[in-house]
């Protein structure tokens, strides 16, 4: 009888212990969430997510800075053209989830992510679909200015539980920004960023990420938003169409030409616009203040690392701006 009682007591204790353990586990599961406020609301993100999918290129750098390699990236199926080669090496092995404008829900779901980072402008209409797959935060990158990018970096850091690491990164960035401002003498010179020039001149407006960065180091941006922004490509309102006559009227002190594989080039490697009589009348052309830069860095890499890369180029590649 005693033996039976002992056995029953042991079994009862085992059941109670298991029940307590299960209850504790469920409680911990609920507790181990981080409430993240973003552009489309508030999302509870699992603490320290490891399987992260990004739907805009600028978010890649931020994750890498925080020690996380994304498992999925919306790369428009042309990663070599759009992603910096050094960054591409670091994320080797990721899965493409299609285009940034129309990411594949099936591919995203197949990766079983525990966090999706979407772009506010591009993915607002599919946000409800995304959050059914995994916790999703939406941040501004496509139309982000400089401060938007800093804010998004801090939000991502909170979502993955690495705020201290990002604060350290931003402190170093601020030091580089100050150093660049001291090394170059912009003296409020007007500057203009130009992308494609095949059919019409596509300039970035004052609200663009790189435009705002340039004003941080002392330049004055040559144009302001005037209602003629291009809203194609998922709401890309930071683009402004200009004619050569309008450009000549603006006549910036410095022109930065962002190059890429979509640009029409002559046999000698020049854009047809560079041989136009009106182009040659521009102040920046006459004074040798036209600079050719990589579009993947100056336009697509909207991140703290992207900003640092631009600051490095400003210090090294623009001698006319040096003291």
Curated annotation (Swiss-Prot):
InterPro entries per UniProt: ABC_transptr_periplasmic_BD, Bact_iron-sidero_bind
Keywords, sorted A to Z: Cell membrane, Lipoprotein, Membrane, Palmitate, Signal, Transport
UniProt superkingdom: Bacteria
Signal sequence interval, chain numbering: 1-19
Domain Fe/B12 periplasmic-binding positions: 51-322
UniProt topology in membrane: Lipid-anchor
Residues bearing a lipid moiety (N-palmitoyl cysteine): 20
Lipid attachment site numbers (S-diacylglycerol cysteine): 20
Signals that turn on the gene: Transcriptionally regulated by fur; repressed by iron.
Compartment(s) of residence: Cell membrane; Membrane raft
First-listed, main subcellular location of the protein, grouped into a coarse class: membrane
Biological process terms in GO annotation: iron coordination entity transport
Annotated GO CC locations: membrane raft; outer membrane-bounded periplasmic space; plasma membrane
Family: Belongs to the bacterial solute-binding protein 8 family.
Subunit organization: Interacts with FloT.
Listed PANTHER family: FE(3+) DICITRATE-BINDING PERIPLASMIC PROTEIN (PTHR30532:SF29), IRON III DICITRATE-BINDING PERIPLASMIC PROTEIN (PTHR30532)
Descriptive protein name: Putative ABC transporter substrate-binding lipoprotein YhfQ
